[in-house]
Amino acid sequence: MFRVLAALLVPFMYMIARFHLHATENVPKTGAFVLAPNHFSEIDPLVMGVSMWQLNRMPRYLAKASLFKIPLFGALLRATGQVPVMRSSGVDRASDPIAAARKIATDGSAVVIYPEGTLTRDPDLWPMRGKSGAVRTALQADIPVIPAAHWGTQKLLPRYGKRISLFPRKDINILFGPPVDLSAFRGRPLDASDYAAATDLVMDAITGLLETLRGETAPAERWDPTTHNQSETGRFEQP
C-alpha cells in the first residue's frame, strides 16, 4: 500500500521541490530505527517520506489515534502500518508503546517520530522542547535514534499555511546525523527524569544539524511553550 501511495505522491513532490540529502550514510540500510526530525510545516511528513523513499526505506509514522477513526482515511493508515498515538496533557504516548515498539523492531521498520510532537512554537522555527515519544520507542525496542533536520519546507508551505507554493521549485535540504548515544539509558529501569534527559540529547542533536543547514546559531535556551503561555498541541496562533 505504501508503495502505491509513493508512486502517486513522489512525482508530485519532485515537481515542486528539489531534494538534497546529506550524510545519508547515517541512515541504516536495514533494520529498525527511529528517525527524529524537526517539525515546522504540515508538509514535513511528506518531505521526510520522500527522503526515506529515496533511501529505499519505507517509513512508518506515529499518528494521532483520532485519525484512525476517520472513515477510509483510518483504514488507509492501518493498511500502511502507521502507529496510533494517544495525546494526554501535552504528552504523546503510543496507545500501547511497548507492543508498538516491539512490532517496529520485529518488522525491521523505520518509524518517523517528531520529538516536538507538533509544529514548533519558536518564532524563528528552531526546534522547541521535545517530548519523550521518540526515546521511549527507541529504548523499549532497543533500536537507534537517527536525528535529522530539514530546511526549506517552509517555502513550500509556511507554518499553518493553507496553500502549497507550487512554483518555482523549492530547494529542500535534509541532513541526517549519526545515532544519538543513549547507552546511558539502556538496560535499566527509567523514570521521567531519565526520559527527559534522553530527549534533551536528541533535541540537541537535531538542533545542531539545523544550525549546520541554516549556517546560524540557535538560541541558547530552547523554546518552551509552557513559559510563553502557549498550548503544546494544536494551533497556537492564527495564520
Predicted regions and their residues:
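A transmembrane-helix-recognition feature enriched in membrane-embedded lipid enzymes
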Residues: M1-K29, P71-T80
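Hydrophobic/aromatic ligand-binding patch that stacks against planar heteroaromatic rings
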Residues: S51, L76, K103, A134-Q140
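Catalytic core of membrane glycerolipid acyltransferases/transacylases, capturing the structured
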Residues: P28-D92
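Catalytic-site beta-strand/loop segments enriched in glycine and acidic/polar residues
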Residues: K103-A134
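A charged, well-structured terminal subsegment
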Residues: I98-K103, K170-T212
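Short gly/ser/thr-rich secondary-structure transition/capping motifs
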Residues: Y14-L21, D92-S95, L156-P158
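Short, highly charged C-terminal tails/helix-capping segments
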Residues: R214-Q238
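A cross-family acyltransferase "interaction/gating" segment
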Residues: P123-A192, W223-P225, F236-E237
